[in-house]
């Protein structure tokens, strides 16, 4: 059975309904109106170069009856070349592209034909579609001075109300404008098999990153936007995070490929921050930092706005070579609730699930309702990491308050980890440990369930630190480590190649082992 995830005026993203992780069980061919248009083996696939407001009949030998869909209608479609864009990779096309965006009528499409469009940051508006066709590249300018600085906070000159415009790692601070930027906009689609290239190596954005005067630009930044869809494109080489929706609602990323060199700093693929309803489906990532990092700000933003990252779905994604496949935090002071990760493959990431929090994130820093199921991990150093002692950011990261193993008072600075379920998973060639879950003595992790999981260890495993905290020793082929957990349920879990005890526990309120 096939389900439509997203249909624009010229593209469609569809998903096979099964319980397999990322890949289907066999190759398949897709026909549109009787003509072969796609072949592949992934659970999610896309069709492009469709006509607006047109009915299509999709057929495949693996479905019993044809699937019929209609593309959306649109008011008009305009080429950026009509506004003077050259697309030779040398000419600065910023003015031409921005003018085209400004002039585009509502419910219309701006088309980028094959070519390389060198540009400074672009500002989008509501009710438009950008189509970046195969062979088209939006290339960020290598001139840093072309990226305007956006203030972190502005105040209404009449009411004094605070408005956040710029943000960096969970704080409202001045930042360079993203290459593709939208503010308080709605109903925006970016589709196509083209590329958006941040051009960070040429601009020198990855050099001396700790001493930049302003937050480095994202590839795409959506601030307080609604109904945003990004479908099909290849995003690469951003100066920092690649896709960053901030305080936005109903955001979806479908069938993207996002890449950056393994050693590139802060090049997370998708980092939704304090967003409500986010879908990340059918995407492939290979980056220098976390593949997906779900955030909700540091304590100032979390305490003031109390806006959790809520109702996020991650499904049928392939994540490679990141620090964490799916990371929560460390900027999560507003909380993370109702997260489902399903049918994904994690390959050679440092960690599978990676929770990063610490004392000081605040009482609103609640992570709860997290489910991982039907996951396959290959060569992941530590598949499950829940760390309430994270020490790799903030000026006080090395303070005794952060690292002390003493039971401190629960106060307005204390985070909370609630219920977590991991089931139907295969984790092959682990190295450091199967699990490393370490709660606070004053605020243990509420409940962890691990069921129907196979962990195997690489015979060539190298010692590694499973989590980033003060005084963290290296592990190698360790089993499941749990400390400070109120209720732990272990059901039908198999470990192969572990050195020592399979289950290492301390300060567990209730242990249920089946």
Label each residue range with its predicted role.
Residues 1-514:
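Extracellular/periplasmic carbohydrate-active domains that bind, remodel
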């Amino acid at each position: 059975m096939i389900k439509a995830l997203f249909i624009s005026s010229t593209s469609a993203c569809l998903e096979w309904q099964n319980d397999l992780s990322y890949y289907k069980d066999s190759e398949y061919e897709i026909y549109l109106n009787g003509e072969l248009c796609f072949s592949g083996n992934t659970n999610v696939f896309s069709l492009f170069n469709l006509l607006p407001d047109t009915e299509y009949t999709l057929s495949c030998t693996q479905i019993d009856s044809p699937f019929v869909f209609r593309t959306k209608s649109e008011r008009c479609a305009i080429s950026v070349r009509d506004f003077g864009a050259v697309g030779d990779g040398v000419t600065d096309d910023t003015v031409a592209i921005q003018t085209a965006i400004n002039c585009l009528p509502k419910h219309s499409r701006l088309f980028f034909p094959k070519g390389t469009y060198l540009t400074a940051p672009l500002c989008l508006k509501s009710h438009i579609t950008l189509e970046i066709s195969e062979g088209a590249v939006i290339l960020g300018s290598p001139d840093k001075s072309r990226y305007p600085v956006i203030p972190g906070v502005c105040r209404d000159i009449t009411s004094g109300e605070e408005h956040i415009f710029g943000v960096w790692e969970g704080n409202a601070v001045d930042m360079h404008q993203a290459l593709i930027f939208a503010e308080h906009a709605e109903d925006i689609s970016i589709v196509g098999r083209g590329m958006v290239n941040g051009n960070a190596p040429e601009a020198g954005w990855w050099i001396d990153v700790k001493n930049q005067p302003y937050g480095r630009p994202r590839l795409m930044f959506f601030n307080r936007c609604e109904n945003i869809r990004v479908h099909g494109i290849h995003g690469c080489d951003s100066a920092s995070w690649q896709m960053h929706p901030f305080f936005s609602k109903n955001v979806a990323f479908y069938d993207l490929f996002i890449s950056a060199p393994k050693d590139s700093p802060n090049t997370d693929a998708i980092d939704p921050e304090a967003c409500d309803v986010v879908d990340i489906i059918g995407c492939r990532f290979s980056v220098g930092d976390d593949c997906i990092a779900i955030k909700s700000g540091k304590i100032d933003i979390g305490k003031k706005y109390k806006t959790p990252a809520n109702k996020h779905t991650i499904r049928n994604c392939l994540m490679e070579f990141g620090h964490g496949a799916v990371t929560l935090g460390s900027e999560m002071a507003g909380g993370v609730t109702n997260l489902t990760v399903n049918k994904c493959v994690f390959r050679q990431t440092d960690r599978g699930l990676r929770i990063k929090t610490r004392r000081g994130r605040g009482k609103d820093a609640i992570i709860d309702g997290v489910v991982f199921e039907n996951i396959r991990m290959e060569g992941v150093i530590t598949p499950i990491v829940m760390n309430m002692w994270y020490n790799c950011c903030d000026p006080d990261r090395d303070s005794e308050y952060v690292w002390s193993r003493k039971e401190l008072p629960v106060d307005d600075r204390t985070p909370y980890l609630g219920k977590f379920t991991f089931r139907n998973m295969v984790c092959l060639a682990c190295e450091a440990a199967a699990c490393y879950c370490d709660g606070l003595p004053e605020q243990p992790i509420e409940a962890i369930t691990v069921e129907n999981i196979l962990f195997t260890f690489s015979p060539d495993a190298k010692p590694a630190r499973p989590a980033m905290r003060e005084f963290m020793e290296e592990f190698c082929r360790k089993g499941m480590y749990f400390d400070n957990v109120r209720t732990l349920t272990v059901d039908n879990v198999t470990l192969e190649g572990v050195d020592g005890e399979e289950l290492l526990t301390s300060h567990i309120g209730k242990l249920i082992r089946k």
